[in-house]
Amino acid sequence: MVDAMPENPAEEPTAASAAPNPEAVPDAVGQPEAPVKDRKVPGEYGASAITVLEGLEAVRKRPGMYIGSTGPRGLHHLVYEVVDNSVDEALAGYATGIDVTLQADGGVRVADDGRGIPVDLHPTEGRPTVEVVMTILHAGGKFGGGGYAVSGGLHGVGISVVNALSRRVDTEVRRQGHVWRMSFADGGVPQGELVKGEATDATGTVQTFYPDAEIFDSIEFDYETLRARFQQMAFLNKGLRITLTDERVQESNEVVDDEIAGEGAAGEDVAENGLAEDAEQEPQRRSVTYLYENGLLDYVQHLNSAKKVEYVHDDVIAFEAEDFSDGRSMAVEVAMQWTSAYSESVHTYANTINTHEGGTHEEGFRAALTSLVNRYAREKEILKPKEDNLSGEDIREGLTAVISVKLSEPQFEGQTKTKLGNSEARGFVSKAVTDHLGDWFERNPGPAKEIIRKAIMASHARLAARKARDNARRKSPLESFGMPGKLADCSSKDPERCEVYIVEGDSAGGSAKQGRNPETQAILPLRGKILNVERARLDKALGNAEIQSMITAFGTNIGEEFDISKLRYHKIVLMADADVDGQHITTLLLTVLFRYMRPLIEAGHVFLAQPPLYRIKWSNAPHDYVFSDEERDAAVEAGLAKGWRYPKDNGVQRYKGLGEMNYQELWDTTMDPEHRTLLQVTMEDAAAADAVFSMLMGEDVESRRTFIQQNAKDIRFLDV
């Protein structure tokens, strides 16, 4: 890969440039006329607000510790870190717009209209503060508490890590009446001093960075990945405008329009279908702008629009609350709506960070919701005295909700640091839900009763499902430990070593049983039809023998009774035919796992086997197994060039199914840990994954067709 410098790099600093004034007033000049928040965060954002903790020495040696990986996820994380800094300015009330540009030269440009990074000399470092922020890890306005009351990204930490992992970064600051410029190269080395440029009344920061190709597996940014992330950020920060523009030349067969109709707020000049207005003149350029004046209310409407469902109540319930007592800052926004769907769709955020592991804010929401609904149902005599209380799971059936809290000192826990641990958030959110939702119930008795009736129906279905499950257990002559009779279990009892293959069909299951390693590999063949749980209630889902077999074999149970510590296999491998039917079966299985056992996906326990599509039978060389038409053509061409021969009859065999392979072929190509390829199923964003499953497996045919047309071209980035 050629490591070309940008075509139009910023000019190098000159000796004649004026040095920053150490006595300069740190307050920003020319604040935005319409801040996102009515009340700006008190306190200065100057040199004294930047706290320094340590340098950048370890970042390039161990990038995974800072951005998670050097693959696509880590690469895109660089953009998020820079944008998070701009979002911090919006949270503080000083920024109204963020522009992100994917440049044709491979760089990413992020511009905001906030206060701009301070440029005066740092009191302890003796260098311009912007240089300190760019080159020293943990040098940011978050840590001392003076610059930000609420911080979503790690302000200063993020940009210094981006600098360390880039071959070039150009920083431009508009502050104190001037434009200031400074450039860095080769992992954060300053290319001269800070340059004071032309006068300006504007404020803000522009960061342009070029990822280092020696560190990342690829430096190609995916437009759709960034688009989805920025749309979510716009939802979470109402009134904040985020524009994403892609200036890279698109391939001629690539679908350019993004079918994002109606996403802009009223009065916002958002081009139809997400296209830039000059798309006719520049067909390779695509751009989309997000601006949501109603924030989470718009978010819930967006999530429900992907589902072909009826609404239990017409309007989205939305409310917010704040608490500034005891020297702390806390705020919560909630938007929620019940639909006719059979699954819940509850998403939580803390300081705009996706807390998909939940936490105290989600606990407070759930506890208050369950208590409130049961109390209301008793008071209005909808629940009879002898009837049991409704469970939280029953109440949340069909609920789409987004809970976003903002705290001055968030504490994150969990395996991926995406679980909120602040104990005070539990009571705060609980009280807000009790007060505001309780008031809504009193003012809307008709819809409130419909919500409770739906929960009662869900309760009846759950009890029927439990009864059917218990009856099935009593009737079945189950093997040891209550396992399904068709499960060929492994001998090892160590879950970390064990894996289970979910295989469709008896013939494939037979080959898999013969070819497996019986010590660590279990086989669960599925013989009947797998139910599409997206269109079925829990009782019907649990009445499906194949789904029941999976639940029993895994050992974790489902729903509120799910316990991942009881998982019997740390690898759950879905192995289906390499054709369209096999892909459909895989999608059905993934839908079951996502709806009823989502933590298995979140914890990285679910994998997709990759069986070959063709066998090339060489007469004078070992056989080749390939996985696509393109690989087949390339392998045949390469083999013939080497003088290899294959018979005229059946020289290239297309496998119609796993059952056509004998057990040795299945082991060699698909099950042998030394040679197989497994794709791990990951889930970056539960809300986006929810929308994908609703679209693919729901009843809205037109939405499904549109989604497939737009994403089939770039399926490698589809992250479910």
UniProtKB/Swiss-Prot annotation:
Keyword Magnesium among record annotations: yes
GO CC annotations, alphabetized: chromosome; cytoplasm
Top-rank taxon: Bacteria
Biased composition (Low complexity): 1-26
Binding site for Mg(2+) 1: 504, 577
EC number(s) per entry: 5.6.2.2
Catalytic activity annotation: ATP-dependent breakage, passage and rejoining of double-stranded DNA
Stretches the record annotates as Disordered: 1-42
CC cofactor note: Binds two Mg(2+) per subunit. The magnesium ions form salt bridges with both the protein and the DNA. Can also accept other divalent metal cations, such as Mn(2+) or Ca(2+).
Annotated GO MF terms: ATP binding; DNA binding; DNA negative supercoiling activity; DNA topoisomerase type II (double strand cut, ATP-hydrolyzing) activity; metal ion binding
UniProt keyword list: ATP-binding, Cytoplasm, DNA-binding, Isomerase, Magnesium, Metal-binding, Nucleotide-binding, Topoisomerase
Matches recorded under HAMAP family: GyrB
Entry's family note: Belongs to the type II topoisomerase GyrB family.
Subunit structure comment from the entry: Heterotetramer, composed of two GyrA and two GyrB chains. In the heterotetramer, GyrA contains the active site tyrosine that forms a transient covalent intermediate with the DNA, while GyrB binds cofactors and catalyzes ATP hydrolysis.
Protein's name in the database: DNA gyrase subunit B
Classification lineage: Bacteria, Bacillati, Actinomycetota, Actinomycetes, Micrococcales
